[in-house]
């Protein structure tokens, strides 16, 4: 006798339930990607298309004039305002590239020097015994609880007294002491046996040799994690660069982007240029994270921080 009714595959039912559980994740991904998609498409639209209501999801005609040359966009008006992104600053030696150069110089310098100083300090705190070590470590941890905004005015006065306004020194030097990096790397180094360092000392290795040959290779995952934190944080830093610069040629990308927005406030024609500048500003940090995300996750996991 044949059974009546249809047979339901339990695996198919489980698969559907799994897809439903993932639906909020898919929606969240769309919400996260939407601003970037809007930024890219708006930077490729003409002035006329930017004024269309409702706005178009795809550019009807791809316009590159927002990035480089306004001659690609015959609808642009007010030539001195609507000049392409990389031609808006004829008084600067490298145009908009000048802001990119400033950002890269400042970011690379701060990131490299901060990691060197932080790793050296973490090595001393975690693998050396000296009087006052615990007190110094408590000071490092305590300084993490002080809001960084507290040091803005004293920091500016000090930089001004040193004559560093509108120089790279004002960007780099105040950003070097980072307590969180010392704390993070110290936590990571506690997982490395002290016997390894002691054995190297018995074999006659100098402290620099131990640091360079043993500590740095073992710190690689944690250093990459801190590199991402530092690089992204300094790349997006706005308030301090705004305070210490009075000349346009020393501005970084976030400051230049804010100035660009203020100069075109209320002008729909500058929206495409602003979106293009925003895209250029965000590309390096996105690329850095995607290139190092595996090391980043590993460094966070092995540090013992939750």
What are these regions (language model features)?
Residues 9-13, 17-306:
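A structural signal for multi-pass alpha-helical bundles of membrane permease subunits
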Residues 1-8:
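ABC-family P-loop ATPase nucleotide-binding domain
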């Amino acid at each position: 006798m044949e059974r009546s009714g249809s047979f339901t595959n339990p695996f198919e039912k489980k698969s559907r339930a799994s897809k439903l559980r993932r639906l909020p994740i898919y929606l969240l991904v769309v919400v996260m990607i939407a601003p970037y998609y809007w930024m890219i498409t708006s930077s490729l639209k003409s002035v006329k298309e930017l004024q269309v209501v409702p706005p178009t999801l795809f550019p009807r005609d791809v316009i590159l004039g927002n990035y480089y040359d306004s001659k690609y966009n015959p609808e642009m008006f007010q030539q001195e305002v609507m000049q392409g992104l990389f031609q808006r600053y004829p008084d600067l030696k490298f145009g908009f590239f000048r802001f990119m150069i400033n950002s890269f110089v400042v970011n690379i310098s701060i990131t490299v020097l901060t990691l060197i100083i932080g790793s050296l300090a973490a090595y001393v705190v975690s693998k050396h015994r000296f009087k006052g070590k615990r007190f110094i470590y408590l000071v490092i941890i305590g300084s993490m609880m002080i809001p960084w905004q507290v040091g803005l005015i004293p920091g500016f006065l000090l930089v001004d007294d040193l004559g560093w306004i509108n120089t790279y020194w004002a960007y780099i030097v105040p950003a070097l002491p980072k307590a969180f990096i010392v704390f993070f790397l110290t936590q990571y180094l506690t997982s490395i046996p002290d016997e390894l360092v002691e054995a190297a000392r018995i074999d006659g290795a100098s402290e620099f040799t131990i640091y360079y040959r043993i500590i740095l290779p073992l710190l690689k995952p944690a250093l990459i994690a801190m590199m991402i934190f530092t690089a992204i944080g300094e790349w997006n830093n706005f308030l301090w660069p705004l305070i210490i610069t009075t000349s346009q040629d020393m501005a970084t990308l976030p400051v230049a982007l804010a100035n660009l927005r203020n100069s075109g406030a209320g002008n729909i024609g500058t929206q495409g240029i602003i979106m293009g500048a925003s895209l250029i500003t965000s590309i390096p940090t996105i690329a850095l994270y995607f290139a190092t995300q595996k090391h980043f996750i590993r460094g966070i996991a092995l540090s013992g921080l939750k």
